[in-house]
Regions:
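A short, polar/charged loop/turn motif at coil->beta-strand junctions and beta-hairpin connectors
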Residues: 5, 31, 55-57
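Sec-dependent signal peptide recognition
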Residues: 1-7
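Tryptophan-anchored aromatic micro-motifs
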Residues: 20-48, 76-80
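N-terminal glycine/threonine-rich, aromatic-flanked beta-hairpin/loop signature
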Residues: 43-84
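Short beta-strand segments that buttress and anchor functional surface loops
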Residues: 37-42, 62-67, 87-91, 115-117
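Beta-sheet ligand-binding and adhesion/scaffold domains
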Residues: 18-28, 51, 86-147
C-alpha cells in the first residue's frame, strides 16, 4: 500500500499540464523577429544563460552567451523560409539550416512563447520569449498583467 501511495504521488508530481499551442509557420516567422529569446530567466546576477535576437532591420541577429553583467556575443545573418532558419555565421563562415518551431505556452513565468531550434548552431535549442515585448501600444502587456 505504501508503494502504491508513493507511486501515485510521484505520478501526480510529474504530470503537470503545460498549456501550449503550436503557431503556424507564417506567424512563427513574424514572432521570431525583434524580441529576446532567452534560455531561462536568470535568478542571480551570476546565472549563465543564452539569448538570441533576430533583427532584420539591423541586417541580421545576435547570439549572446552571458550573465546579467558580462558576456560574449556573435553576430550572424539569417533568412527564414517556411519552418526553417538559415544561419550565416559570419565569424566561422558556417552556414546552418535548422527547423524551428514557436509555441504559445503558459510559463515558465514571465514567458508566453517558446522557440525550439532543432539544429541550433550555438545554444541549448529551447528559448523563451514574450509576445508583449514587441507590443507597441501595450495592450498585450496590460492583458498579461491582469491575469
Amino acid at each position: 500500500m505504501r508503494t502504491a501511495v508513493l507511486l501515485v504521488a510521484t505520478l501526480a508530481a510529474c504530470s503537470t499540464t503545460v498549456k501550449h499551442r503550436d503557431v503556424d509557420d507564417a506567424e512563427a516567422r513574424k514572432l521570431l523577429l525583434d524580441r529576446n529569446w532567452i534560455e531561462h530567466m536568470p535568478q542571480t546576477e551570476r546565472d549563465h544563460f543564452h539569448v538570441y535576437r533576430f533583427v532584420p532591420s539591423m541586417g541580421g541577429g545576435v547570439f549572446q552567451d552571458r550573465t546579467i553583467f558580462k558576456g560574449t556575443f556573435e553576430l550572424f545573418q539569417f533568412e527564414t523560409a517556411a519552418d526553417e532558419i538559415r544561419f550565416n555565421l559570419l565569424e566561422t563562415h558556417d552556414k546552418v539550416v535548422s527547423k524551428f518551431r514557436i509555441e504559445e505556452v503558459d510559463g515558465p513565468e514571465p514567458f508566453d512563447l517558446k522557440l525550439t531550434i532543432a539544429a541550433d548552431p550555438r545554444g541549448p535549442q529551447v528559448y523563451y520569449g514574450m509576445r508583449a515585448e514587441t507590443d507597441r501600444d501595450g495592450t498585450k502587456l496590460e492583458a498579461r498583467l491582469r491575469k
